[in-house]
Amino acid sequence: MAVRKSKVKIKTKATSETKAKRPTAKARKALKAASAKRTRSTDKPGALCTIGYEKALPGAVIGELTRAGVKLVVDVRAVAASRRPGFSKKQLAAGLDEAGIGYLHLQPLGTPEAGREAARAGKIDALIRIYDRHLQTKTAQESLGELAGLVKARKPLLALLCYCRNPNTCHRSRIVAALEERMPLAVDDLVPPPA
């Protein structure tokens, strides 16, 4: 199984809805050290995977999800459509269903159009700024709360799905960072074999 332990730790703006008080410097240092050692663990309050389908076939993505024990895919694309066969919403949901994996599309957690344009242009800093602003909207916060509830429940194990192969250049790393502000997480960034 191709699992890459992510070492991503990106700060997000805190709001009164997401965090009442900023952690001390000592707490931030401990959180940073813990996030650098991410691993799958059942003793943490939350565990999740992330996966991107760039350069992969649907069977490879589903196989990687199955090997990791994922039972629910949370699609965090703004537009759940793809020119790549098997990755549009209905096709993906059907393929996942055949493998015994559920599907949920949380469209409000998708990247707004301006962010997608920045990503296509390779302007990752702009993507992050745009997405961080978007993540503070009411609808995004509601969906983030729904996602946090699913992660806290710990069953089923879920995976955030988006297009980008590299989580470091994808908005799903920002979603993970926002979840980490709410709870400790064990995160696996799954990388399916390329086609």
Where are the language model's segments positioned?
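Residues lining hydrophobic/aromatic ligand-binding pockets adjacent to catalytic sites
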Residues: 2-195
